[in-house]
Amino acid sequence: MKANDKQIDTLVEDIYSLLDNGTKNPDRGSLYGMAAAMMEAVRRQLWSPTSERKPTLRMSNIGKPCTRSLWYDMNGDEQAENFSPQTRLKFLMGDLVEALILFLAKEAGHEVTDQQKEVQIDGIKGHLDAVIDGQLVDVKSTSSYGMRKFKDGTLPSDDPFGYIDQMSGYGNALGKDSGTFLAFDKSSGELTTYTQTELSDTSQRIGLVKQAMERVDPPDRPFEPVLDKSARRKKLGVNCSYCSHKTTCWADVGLDLKFRSGRPVFFLAKSKSESQNNAETF
């Protein structure tokens, strides 16, 4: 769909306006493109033989803030946790949301190109989401908590999933000096944009990651446990709690799983003696 000299600064406003007013003649090619992207997302999540895939370094994982976790991804971990059905559904919904939002961007008059374009740096491949109005864009579905980091610009100081390094890879490959996140709040339906104006050096990052992956032993743990004040025990922080390799990674101290308000809390087993009188569940 040909853009009408739109700028990405008005993208969210224009999508909202489209949803308010609708359009009598949606572009049929764009509709088919959205449908094809959704079908591919469903096929990939439901029928791709993930257990048979050989793990490889990609743009989407070299930005992981924990190279130790990535080492286990590449070199194997017999105790690694498989993705739960809920997690797979969450990933699928993220792909479907991406296809829908990019369609809405087109219908709102913005130029959307290079969807799922493959790029490569130093042998590491990746597929970017899109380029909108000439700007590199990565669509993210997020929680209300995560949304705040995009809205107030604090993502650079709190990026547990390596979004900026991933964006930097795409930007470096395309010769861009910035990249824009188009974030969607899964709870409220709100959209916002955040532009990262400083991209990291992907080639340097790739070199360091490749060196780490070739080691016989995994790199040191980059994250320390945090103190749970109410239990007076040490527990895993956010990054480690969500990691599929936490059992192996913390085997030297062991983990003590408890639940608080229905949510798992991973205490260090060796810290149990610090508070023997605490209740086992919260």
Give short role names for the model-derived ranges.
Residues 1-136, 143-157:
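Metal-dependent nuclease catalytic cores that hydrolyze phosphodiester bonds in DNA/RNA
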Residues 131, 136-139, 178-183:
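A structural signal for short, well-ordered beta-strand segments and their strand-loop junctions
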Residues 159, 163:
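Short, conserved glycine- and acidic-residue-centered signature motifs
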Residues 136-143, 207-213:
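Short, basic, helix/turn surface patches
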Residues 5, 23-29, 157, 169, ...:
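Metal-dependent nuclease catalytic regions and adjoining charged, substrate-binding loops involved
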